[in-house]
Amino acid sequence: MSGRKKSLLKVIILGDSSVGKTSLMNQYVNKRFSNQYKATIGADFCTKEVVVNDRVVTMQIWDTAGQERFQSLGVAFYRGADCCVLVYDVTAPNSFKNLDSWRDEFLIQASPRDPDHFPFVVLGNKVDLDNRQVSTRRAQQWCQSKNDIPYYETSAKEGINVEMAFQVIAKNALELEAEAEVINDFPDQITLGSQNNRPGNPDNCQC
């Protein structure tokens, strides 16, 4: 594995308080779930090393507080994100309605190079519970209306689709990073047609 190229990918998880953001991160990184709810204060992160397309990737996964007083964490927190995960609780309709606000908040704060094609992933969490309020179809329609955002229904408690979802998150984040590397490899743009740069102009002689 030492010959593989390594990458650090910054992934931000957003969503209302108590939708299961911390539990999803802990299930993915530590294979652990706790029934004791503890609100995240500000932001925290975990890292996990995975292999995507024969490339070693260190995912830096940022878990954020969902309370309103923490909603504006500042430009520095969002800057440099390679993927944004939007999480809602399938038993809490308001958490689904607020996905628009969280998506807008991210785009405003992060100011990605190409906002229309920035990689988001939506997770409908707590599918292990019986009192579901948001249908799969409704969630899929919302994702389709936002440029076909990938959508997964998960259970942090049971580990349902958590590994699969984060594999897609890593893959999409890596693709964004690769595109950014290609753009940065291009030299500065040269403007042609300037009168002073035309051949034969005596004032532009390089002799």
From Swiss-Prot:
Q: Where is this motif: Effector region?
A: 37-45
Residues carrying lipid (S-geranylgeranyl cysteine): 205, 207
Q: Where does GTP bind?
A: 15-22, 34-40, 63-67, 125-128, 156-157
Keywords, A to Z, come to: Autophagy, Cell projection, Cytoplasmic vesicle, Endosome, GTP-binding, Hydrolase, Lipoprotein, Lysosome, Membrane, Nucleotide-binding, Phosphoprotein, Prenylation, Protein transport, Synapse, Transport
Protein's GO biological process: autophagosome-lysosome fusion; border follicle cell migration; clathrin-dependent endocytosis involved in vitellogenesis; endocytic recycling; endocytosis; endosomal transport; endosomal vesicle fusion; endosome to lysosome transport
Instruction: Name the PROSITE patterns on file.
Output: RAB
- Hey, which family's this protein in? Belongs to the small GTPase superfamily. Rab family.
The protein's name in its UniProt record:
Ras-related protein Rab7
